[in-house]
Amino acid sequence: MKNTTFIFLAIFSTFLFVACGDDNNTTTETQEVVQLKGHEELDLNQWGFPMAIMVPDAENHGEPQVVLTNRGALEIVVGQSFGIEIMYGEGDIELLKMDLEEDLVFVSEILSQEENLLIYKQDIPESGVKTQHHFFYKATINNDVYEIRDLQSEQFGEKMIQDMIKAVKTLRYVPAASTATDA
């Protein structure tokens, strides 16, 4: 009887340790570098953003142009078909949807919505203005919330927006490298 109780306690303890173990495995899995064909990784730490993202490769599209704006947004432009901005925020998709509905200039249509992503298009009826496609993505990286969207000042086609979304979904946490002055 004592042996049975001991074996039962040993098995129960093993399950308890496994179930209550450290969650580092999920963190490691989310830190894997996702490769996209024709893209290369861009580390954003030098602009104060502890993350990296896959952007179209420089060989075929030109060097990434990265600018930290006065309002705190990090704008990344590569060639003519890639332009995004990343900034701290709440990532409130519902608020954006309300803004789109109440817009007095544009007629907006939501094309697709996921938990952290909104894809929409805007048009000014009978104006001759080309339909604009946009996206808004909410990313939580190292417990900070970031809002990522296409550059509103540019015009991108639907396929360009889809390609940017694929790149944005590769965002991952990359801690800043320690320097001698940190010690």
Identify the role of each PLM range.
Residues 5-8, 15-72, 151-183:
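N-terminal targeting sequences that direct proteins away from the cytosol to non-cytosolic compartments
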Residues 65-159:
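Conserved polar/disulfide-associated segments of primarily extracytoplasmic proteins
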